[in-house]
Curated annotation (Swiss-Prot):
Source organism per UniProt: Mycoplasmopsis agalactiae (strain NCTC 10123 / CIP 59.7 / PG2)
Skewed-composition ranges (Basic and acidic residues): 29-60
Keywords, ordered alphabetically: Ribonucleoprotein, Ribosomal protein, RNA-binding, rRNA-binding
Location of the region described as Disordered in the Swiss-Prot/TrEMBL record: 1-63
Protein name: Small ribosomal subunit protein uS5
Length: 231
């Protein structure tokens, strides 16, 4: 292409009448390879080397979301209390709703959450999300009851948990029942003392469950054999 352009420039100069003889000026050469290289470099930023990594990352995120969704489907939830709250501001009063929710998988994991919103469903959703972010693991003796008797206190609320024989069922008030049932206990004695605040009773129950120890854990703490503890 460059040679043809040089010849045409020479022919035009020679054909003009009275034109002085001048040196032919060649047109600037096009660096087609350079242009192609630039295009290739631009494409290389989005070539197949980077795309698989992004696609793999996206696929992993989708898998993790799916697994998280499947894990969340295993959890059950119970609304402990819903109350209407008021906030006094300069323009007057603002009303909203407060919700307390307990979630658990009935396999040894349970959590308690609080949510506040202008509508009841939104408050419950926030409470469920908060509860799932504050899950605890609790021991279940023989898959039915607590390993031993335990007492716990939160502010003015007190709770007692005691093992029960198989077939006895859950002997508890509605607030404590929601916690122990979602935790996975099927036979247990409970008793509440002091303040009847539902939120405080739930927190006292969770505090008691956190203090539970399996025979293996107690034997390890005392540096003894499990058989010696159980007699």
């Amino acid at each position: 292409m460059a040679d043809l352009e040089n010849k045409t420039v020479k022919a035009n100069v020679e054909n003009k009448p009275g034109a002085a003889k001048t040196q032919s000026v060649s047109a600037p050469k096009r660096t087609e390879s350079g242009a192609k290289k630039q295009i290739w470099e631009k494409r290389s930023a989005h070539d197949s080397k980077d795309m698989p990594k992004k696609s793999v990352d996206r696929a992993n995120k989708v898998k993790n979301r799916t697994r998280f969704g499947e894990a969340n489907n295993e959890f059950s939830e119970k609304v402990v209390n819903i109350s209407r709250v008021t906030k006094v501001v300069k323009g007057g009063r603002r009303f909203s709703f407060s919700a307390f929710v307990v979630v658990g998988d009935k396999k040894g994991k349970v959590g308690f959450g609080h949510g506040k919103a202008n509508e009841v469903p939104d408050a419950i959703k926030k409470a469920v999300k908060d509860a799932r972010n504050h899950l605890i693991s609790v021991p279940i003796q023989n898959k039915i009851t607590v390993p031993h008797e335990i007492h716990a206190k939160f502010l003015a609320s007190k709770v007692m948990l005691k093992p029960a024989p198989k077939g006895k069922g859950i002997v508890a008030s509605g607030t404590v029942r929601a916690v122990v049932e979602l935790a996975g206990y099927t036979d247990i004695y409970t008793k509440t003392y002091g303040s009847r605040s539902k939120a405080n009773i739930v927190r006292a129950t969770l505090k008691a469950l956190q203090q539970l120890r399996t025979p293996e854990q107690i034997a390890e703490i005392r540096d003894k054999d499990v058989k010696d503890l159980l007699g």
